[in-house]
């Protein structure tokens, strides 16, 4: 076999506006991010290709750094050419930001060592028609110091069963969170004018997350920010392991999957035997 005739496995970094999609995963009779990528990559591969993502994002959730894997039976050009070929056929609200070749056995879920999510919140001010799909607007006032204290409660290794959404239960609900913090931000519209209200970003890094976990953490912290609960209530919710004890699920539109981390060895491509 010639080196350029072997199947090649690729790591795609994908960004998308999830507003018009049913989510990442293929669903019958609906548009999904996965189905759009598979539709575009199929003619490049000459056959149906399964595109596997690093995790499911729900309808309305966005990504800056989702990771997907695809295997092409024969691709003789470089990764830049593949990126351009895919992007030339994708709709405007999905883009492949980078393509890297990986080892054959690369798995975007099993090989991931960490993820980062951000959730954008607008406190007060009028709802902006352009930013509306990317931010959760809430009424004020909000106690940001209390929410910062609540966020700190999530850092470390905990059982997050109380924050697991229904429909995708995992055998273990224990996860390690490396950092969780609220960051003030300046938000601007298409013309560069600063938007009304206060704008905040909740940023969380961890080894992995349960289904709907970040949105459930958000809804719970907002209960604290509104003064309905104290930051110490978070300890009670974690200890309860009961979803009913936590706050409501926050809306999807403020959530972004920003980054998925992998060890360097994922990108160490095995050299095939070359038959002279």
Curated annotation (Swiss-Prot):
Q: Which catalysed reactions does the entry list for this protein?
A: uridine(38/39/40) in tRNA = pseudouridine(38/39/40) in tRNA
Quote the record's binding site residues for substrate.
Answer: 117
SUPFAM superfamilies per record: Pseudouridine synthase
InterPro entries given for it? PsdUridine_synth_cat_dom_sf, PsdUridine_synth_TruA, PsdUridine_synth_TruA_a/b_dom, PsdUridine_synth_TruA_C, TruA/RsuA/RluB/E/F_N
Which keywords appear in this protein's UniProt record, sorted alphabetically?
A: Isomerase, tRNA processing
What residues form the catalytic site here?
58 (nucleophile)
Q: What is its EC number?
A: 5.4.99.12
> Which Pfam families does the UniProt entry name for this protein?
PseudoU_synth_1
Q: Which GO terms describe its biological process?
A: tRNA pseudouridine synthesis
Q: Which GO terms describe its molecular function?
A: pseudouridine synthase activity; RNA binding; tRNA pseudouridine(38-40) synthase activity
Enzyme's top EC category:
isomerase
Gene3D superfamilies, A to Z: Pseudouridine synthase I, catalytic domain, C-terminal subdomain, Pseudouridine synthase I, catalytic domain, N-terminal subdomain
* PANTHER family associated with the record: PSEUDOURIDYLATE SYNTHASE (PTHR11142), TRNA PSEUDOURIDINE SYNTHASE-LIKE 1 (PTHR11142:SF0)
Per its database record, what is this protein's job? Formation of pseudouridine at positions 38, 39 and 40 in the anticodon stem and loop of transfer RNAs.
Question: Subunit info?
Answer: Homodimer.
The family note in this entry says:
Belongs to the tRNA pseudouridine synthase TruA family.
Name recorded for this polypeptide: tRNA pseudouridine synthase A
